Every structure is written in structure tokens, then in C-alpha cells.
């Protein structure tokens, strides 16, 4: 049985994170190696979007949770690559002038700034197609597993989830309530966290009730991280975060609706619920270790850039 990483042993935990991040990064790079079969500017736009660093949290969650559930890493890798690739594609669209009109992403020019809007849009579409292809062609998985993973990913990016949430973000109700915002976060941000939790659970063939609870944990983790993102947009430093801040100016978020302190409390409550669900369904393990470290790092970024304590998640 896996022994949880001692969070006080920073070097050991960083080594584990670096290994996962490196494995995912290598596999993503391999997926982007088309040679001369793809127009060079399009391939460059795709690579710019998906290979420019990033924390790889969603992909690492696939590997961590899959490890806890006893799924071999080789069977998890295509899901991790696909989710990271879809996430990058969604950011390309999110940054477009007709959306958030962001100029920087992952400490470099946004894809539409570097390559133009047309190439950025085509890069996003191509990344999504490539993500599905990576899973559909994974011979480490059974045909049934490939089908269930593709179904999960298709739903995650579709009109009932990520795309619907992005629409809600662009055209919110005039008087948005807290529940309106939570619903938006569940669709837009939670979608890929749910997928990151569902994919390894599906591969582990957990029972339907456990699958539901694991997916619910992913949904709540997505809500927590969107709240942290709102707080960083409100109080953060662009250099420390690696992307534009102030993009939510004039938009109602939980950070502006509730205030930073109450929003941070809500995020902490969501994280506590995530940890409870995982302890009861999966048990102590690498996924919980990773989630705690993710929350601590995001909170640390917020405190460093804002010089305040109200971004600290106090979930146990």
C-alpha cells in the first residue's frame, strides 16, 4: 500500500511531482510531433499552447488518483495527456479578444498574440482533436475503457460543461447570486477536474456510487480552484502568476460578491469536502497529498503577491 508522502519532506515530494510532470510533459511533446504532415505555423501554435510549462495539476491528479486506485501508470498516461491538452486548448479560446482578451498566458504571449487569431482558433480545435485521438489509439486500454474515457472527455468540454460554463461567464445574469456563480464554476472550471477524477476511477472499475462520489470531489475541487483564481485576479501580481490579472474587472465573481475573506473561507470549505470524499472512498494517498500541496502553493502565490492572509486554505 502506498505510504503518503511526508509533506515536511519537501525534497521527496518535489521529486515525485517532478517525475509526474516530466512524464506528462514528454508524452504531450510526443503527441505534438507531427513532422511535415501538419502546417508548420499550426503545429507551432499548438506546441506554444500546450508545451509552455504549466503546472500540469490536472494530469498529475490523474496519475496520483490512479496510483491510489491501483491502476498502472501506463494505462493512465493517455488520459493525463488528453486532459492537459484539452485544458491548453480551452485557455487558447479563453484568451481570445472576443472572450477575455488576455495578452499573456503561462509567462509568455497568449497564442493569439504570438500567432494571430485564426491560427490560435485552429490550434485550439486541433488540440482537442489530438486529445481524443491519443486516447482512442491507446492500446494499453481495452476498447470499452477507451470509449468510456472519450465519452468523459467529450462531456467535459461540451455544452453541458466547459463550453456552457464559458458562455455563462460571457453572458452572466444581471444580478448574479452566489448559487449562479457556483453553477458557472461547476461547469467551466470543474469540468476538467471531474474528468481528471473520473478517468482513473473508470479505469479502476469502481462501483457506481464510488464513481459518483469521486466525481463530486473533482467538482468541488474545481470550485475551490476557481475561487482561488478569482482571488488572484483581484489581488495578485501578473509576474508572480504568469498571466494577466484584472481580467475579471467589472465581472461579478465570488471574490467580489462575498469579499476576499469570505470567498477564501468558501474555498477552504470546498477543499475540506474534497478531502473528506477522497478519504472515505479512496483512503489516504497520493491524491490527497497532491491536493494539499496544490492548495498550499496557490495560497502562497496569493499571499506573496497580495501581502495578505485571506487566501490561506484552512481545510484539514
Predicted regions and their residues:
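Polar low-complexity intrinsically disordered regions
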Residues: 1, 91, 273-276, 280, ...
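Mg2+-dependent prenyl diphosphate-binding active-site environment of isoprenoid biosynthetic enzymes
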Residues: 32, 36-281, 285-299
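C-terminal domain/tail detector
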Residues: 290, 294-307, 311-312, 316
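Short linear motifs in intrinsically disordered/low-complexity regions
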Residues: 3, 7-10, 137-139, 208, ...
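N-terminal amphipathic/basic leader segments beginning at the initiator methionine
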Residues: 1-32
